[in-house]
């Protein structure tokens, strides 16, 4: 199976550089690394250029028009050629078996939800200043490297556990619902909308617990000024089981 790793980022090249370094440590190299950039400055573009000889990077950039994570991810999906799509945020470090385990646990008709642990501000500074190596961040972690059966299948009720900082699913399941809804602007609930529409389409949730987890670098909280608007939009999706396709998406059939 061909694998695309889609990394969202916005004006945080130091964190993105650390994330890309964690990609180089993977036991299973992704076939595509698609950086989904929500309008960063030229500094991020320069960083990506410095990695082109080490990773199969494709750059998907949208102009800076507020927080538009949905549009950014959809552009990355559009550019991808792989069967399996793995989504992470540009401040989430991956342990060496991350891609390998996502592939082992992946199954058409399921979205795999991975976990995370939050790094403190001091831990994050140590990592970004390279006082601590990326490999040592996960030095004492013990990961399960096998599917472990049906206990991972959570059905459709555990959707609140699914975060786009660490999830994977097959491309066909993503495209069937036209990806992420680009009518969500600003922080909040575009990922929950995505998961609920997947469930409405028949996709089930699988747990990646104890198998795939990321180290989420510390960052200041994003503005919540549009959360109430996004919440109203999400409630419509949540209560309408016929709502499957994104209201607005470049992936519309």
Where are these regions (language model features)?
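Short, acidic, metal-binding catalytic loop of nucleotide-sugar glycosyltransferases
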Residues: 21-30
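A short, conserved alpha-helix in the catalytic core of glycosyltransferases
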Residues: 161-162, 166-178, 185-204, 209-210
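A conserved acidic beta->alpha catalytic loop
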Residues: 29, 37-46, 92
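Short aromatic/hydrophobic "clamp" motif used to bind/position activated sugar donors
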Residues: 85
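Short, flexible, basic/aromatic active-site loop/helix in glycosyltransferases
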Residues: 132-160
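Glycine-rich, basic loop-to-helix element that forms the pyrophosphate-binding segment
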Residues: 63-80, 97
């Amino acid at each position: 199976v061909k694998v695309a790793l889609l990394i969202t980022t916005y004006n945080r090249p130091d964190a993105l550089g650390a994330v890309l370094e964690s990609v180089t440590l993977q036991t299973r190299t992704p076939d595509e690394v698609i950086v989904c950039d929500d309008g960063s400055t030229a500094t991020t573009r320069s960083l990506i250029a410095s990695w082109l000889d080490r990773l199969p990077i494709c750059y998907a950039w949208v102009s800076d028009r507020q927080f538009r994570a949905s549009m950014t991810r959809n552009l990355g999906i559009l550019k991808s050629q792989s069967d399996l799509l793995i989504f992470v945020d540009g401040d989430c470090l991956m342990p060496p078996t991350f891609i390998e385990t996502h592939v082992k646990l992946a199954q058409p008709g399921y979205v795999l939800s991975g976990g995370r642990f939050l790094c403190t501000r001091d831990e994050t500074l140590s990592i970004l200043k390279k006082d601590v190596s990326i490999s040592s961040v996960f030095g004492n972690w013990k990961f399960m490297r096998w599917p472990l059966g049906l206990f991972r299948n959570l059905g459709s009720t555990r959707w609140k556990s699914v975060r786009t900082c660490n999830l994977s699913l097959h491309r066909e399941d993503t495209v069937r619902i036209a990806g992420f809804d680009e009518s969500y602007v600003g922080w909040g609930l575009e990922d929950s909308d995505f998961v609920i529409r997947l469930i409405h389409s028949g996709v089930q949730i699988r747990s990646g617990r104890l198998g795939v987890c990321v180290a989420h670098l510390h960052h200041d909280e994003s503005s919540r000024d549009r959360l109430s608007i996004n919440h109203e939009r999400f409630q419509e999706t949540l209560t309408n089981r016929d709502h499957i396709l994104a209201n607005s998406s470049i992936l519309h059939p």
